């Protein structure tokens, strides 16, 4: 599929897509046939801070709809600002940074 995908233009989609490609390349370099690699679609979450401690978020999971021959998104939203969401956002960011750049 080229263009017209349901994915937002976000750093999270880029990051998750990169990890999927890396896993597939690693398996192919080990000799695993392409047909044996499981199909994977990215996931997405976006946190937005509404003040210095509270955040809201939206997330999406994607699946292939064989009947319609297209990717479908299933979204979840928490628009109730909370400190717990703010803490989750910080934890999410620290986890990504640790994965990309190594432990601080």
Task: Cite the ranges covered by each PLM segment.
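C-terminal auxiliary extensions adjacent to catalytic cores
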Residues: 57-104
């Amino acid at each position: 599929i080229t263009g017209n995908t349901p994915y937002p233009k976000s750093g999270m989609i880029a990051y998750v897509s990169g990890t999927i490609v890396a896993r597939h390349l690693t398996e192919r370099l080990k000799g695993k046939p392409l047909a044996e690699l499981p199909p994977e679609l990215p996931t997405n979450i976006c946190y937005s801070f509404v003040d210095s401690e509270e955040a809201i978020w939206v997330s999406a999971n994607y699946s292939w709809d064989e009947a319609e021959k297209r990717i479908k998104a299933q979204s979840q939203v928490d628009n109730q600002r909370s400190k717990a969401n703010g803490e989750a956002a910080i934890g999410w960011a620290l986890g990504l940074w640790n994965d990309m750049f190594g432990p601080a």
